[in-house]
Swiss-Prot record:
Residues 228-248 are annotated as: Linker. NCBIfam families: glmU, PRK09451.1. It catalyses: alpha-D-glucosamine 1-phosphate + acetyl-CoA = N-acetyl-alpha-D-glucosamine 1-phosphate + CoA + H(+); N-acetyl-alpha-D-glucosamine 1-phosphate + UTP + H(+) = UDP-N-acetyl-alpha-D-glucosamine + diphosphate. Acetyl-CoA binds at residues 378, 384-385, 403, 421, 438. Signal peptide: none annotated. Transmembrane segments: none annotated. It comes from Actinobacillus pleuropneumoniae serotype 7 (strain AP76). GO terms for cellular component: cytoplasm; membrane. The keyword Protein biosynthesis does not apply. This is Bifunctional protein GlmU. Homotrimer.
């Protein structure tokens, strides 16, 4: 099987974005456009990915530092053909070279596999798309199924203007062919640039076949040159992902008000209300219900869990039949066992909460272990930080912590203990002990409230 290398053009400045950020680093579904393209290139088993960079190259390399790409500098942006010329020295004669664009993030593995499979032994496979309104695009001229020319709008005659099949710029050819044609490109045109589309005419002159393959959807090959086009790509992507989830059995209350910025694995009878955002890798069990306005990132949610509105869960695990929210925050390292309750304005970070325990109101639990069947009252704080270091709070099983208590770590509260409301606990508590540390209540007879001065 012929090896494949991919060239991704990513040197453009993106002037119409009106941004200091390189164009290809603008995001779709929470991920830079060029990252989408790199990920797709990996899926088709590219031996090598050559990334052409220019404007904002330092930032681009910083953001993609973990990617195994060959960085190729295009110091001057003199057209698509010029960009390919910079990568040509790295091409092996006997490999296939696939040319992609860093600002066209939605191209799919399946489309690229069809394109590569269609490449003639000696020739080019060119990706095209059919448009309802092809105005402004180069028309594909065919003879006997083979592409013989790409005619730009301004050069097309009346018959050619009726053609709806247009060029996307995505193509695949052998390394030897590309090197030959790229060496013969010239910039004798109004823009003074080197156009990759000129290789189509060269291939025909050499007697090579140019095979066109049509993309099934225009948005798959659409690029983003401005914020409006970027927003259109985002909406198309979200619509596509929502439709996949609906067809897989997830109930989305309103598919137009749901965003996924990663991957979602789910069980049966999952229900997701409006304005929910999924980020990173999220796993939902069976019969999970997610209320409006929740954000879930890199988390695992067990069967029969209810997440009430406006809760945020990040890098956390929630056990079966738990109830979360509304307005709860689970931070990285939160691990909730089965049948736990976490209520409104509760924050849990780097803590384990045992089966059946309840943390229902206005509470912070951080760097802690909470046993099973505990009740943590409203306003309880685990004081885990002394300004320099963090310390752990350990709470056993069947512990009751009264409202407005402070547990100053490091501290251990053993099984069955009761902490009276308003206590400040600085020492370990033994099993079944009651701790009270409040000022004795005073009664002042005949007290008169102050009155306002007139």
């Amino acid at each position: 099987m012929t090896q494949l290398s991919v060239v991704i053009l990513a040197a453009g400045k993106g002037t119409r974005m009106y941004s200091d950020l390189p164009k290809v680093l603008h995001t779709v579904a929470g991920k830079p456009m060029v990252q989408h393209v790199i990920d797709t290139a990996k899926q088709i088993d590219a031996k090598q990915i050559h990334l052409i960079y220019g404007h904002g190259g330092e930032l681009l390399q910083q953001r993609l530092s973990s990617e195994p790409v060959n960085w190729v500098l295009q110091a001057e942006q003199l057209g698509t053909g010029h960009a390919m010329q910079q990568a040509a020295p790295f091409f092996a004669d006997d490999e296939n070279i696939l040319m992609l664009y860093g600002d066209a993030p939605l191209i799919t593995k399946e489309t690229l596999e069809r394109l590569i499979a269609a490449k003639p032994e000696n020739g080019i496979a060119l990706l095209t798309v059919e448009l309802e309104n092809p105005t402004g695009y180069g028309r594909i001229i065919r003879e006997n199924g083979s592409v013989v020319a790409i005619v730009e709008q301004k050069d097309a005659n009346a018959e050619q203007l009726k053609i709806r099949e247009v060029n996307t710029g995505v193509m695949v050819a052998s390394g030897a062919s590309f090197k030959k044609w790229l060496a013969n490109l010239n910039n004798n045109n109004a823009q003074g640039e080197y156009y990759i589309t000129d290789v189509i005419a060269m291939a025909n002159q050499d007697g090579y076949k140019v095979q066109a393959v049509q993309a099934s959807e225009f948005m798959e090959v659409e690029g983003a040159n401005n914020r409006l086009q970027l927003a259109a790509l985002e909406r198309f992507y979200q619509k596509t992902q929502a439709e996949k989830l609906l067809l897989a059995g997830v109930r989305l209350i309103d598919q137009a008000r749901f965003d996924i910025r990663g991957s979602l694995t789910h069980g049966k009878d999952v229900e997701i209300d409006v304005n929910v955002i999924i980020e990173g890798e999220v796993k939902l069990g069976n019969r999970v219900r997610i209320g409006a306005g929740c954000v879930l990132k890199n988390c695992e949610i067990g069967d029969d869990v209810e997440i009430k509105p406006y809760s945020v869960i990040e890098d956390a695990v929630v056990g079966k039949a738990a109830q979360i929210g509304p307005f709860s925050r689970l931070r990285p390292g939160a691990n909730l066992a089965e049948e736990t309750h976490v209520g409104n304005f509760v924050e849990i970070k780097n803590a384990q909460v045992g089966k059946g325990s309840k943390v229902n109101h206005l509470t912070y639990v951080g760097d802690a272990e909470v046993g099973s069947n505990c009740n943590i009252g409203a306003g309880v704080i685990t004081c885990n930080y002394d300004g320099a270091n963090k310390f752990k709070t350990i709470i056993g099983n069947n512990v009751f912590v009264g409202s407005d208590s402070q547990l100053v770590a490091p501290v251990t509260i053993a099984d069955g203990a009761t902490i009276g409301a308003g206590a400040t606990v600085t020492k370990d508590v033994a099993e079944n002990e009651l701790v009270i540390s409040r000022v004795p209540q005073r009664h002042i007879q005949g007290w008169q409230r102050p009155t306002k001065k007139k």
